[in-house]
Amino acid sequence: LTAFGCRTATFFRIAIAGFLLAAVGETVSPVRSLADSPITRENARPGGTDWILTDPADHEVEGYASATSIQRGDKLHFYIHSTDPRITVAIYRMGWYAGAGARLVQGGISLPGVRQPMPSADPVTGLIECDWQVSYTLNTATDDPGEWLSGVYLAKLTGTSSGKQSYIIFTVRDEARKA
């Protein structure tokens, strides 16, 4: 299609959609506006770009979570290995945030760096399993309905002396919230 043809087709689609909305507008039951959605309100908040890795680690700092998805209100354990003597953890919720991509929801977490043991393969099954100690426990329990909304979160790990960074990625669900 030419540019003119695409514009014409788009115009007709919009016109038909408008006609259909006008025709059935009286019979459609009222629904909650998207602006009333907790997720929409959250994504309208200001974000930042500090969540982006500026010096990705090559095993200097790395970790994993006890689960990839948790229910809002649950606790989540982080298992972190670091060659740095101290690390910081900052938790970001991914979202629109005016195009910034994420918003800091919890920062200022300073932890001692721990060199965790290198995992080895099970000789029978070949399974490689980390048997690391818990470095930090994140608690998502809150009475504030605007905190720990469902979504994808990043725990950004940063070695304080090396500046090396990596992520632990997890999801928070809210099964009590109506879709």
Question: What are the language-model segments listed below?
Answer:
Residues 1-10:
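N-terminal secretory signal peptides that target proteins for export/translocation
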Residues 4, 22-24, 74:
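Intrinsically disordered low-complexity regions specifically enriched for long asparagine
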Residues 28-179:
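Extended, solvent-exposed regions of the mature portions of secreted/cell-surface glycoproteins
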Residues 5, 14-18, 166:
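Low-complexity, intrinsically disordered regions enriched in charged/polar residues
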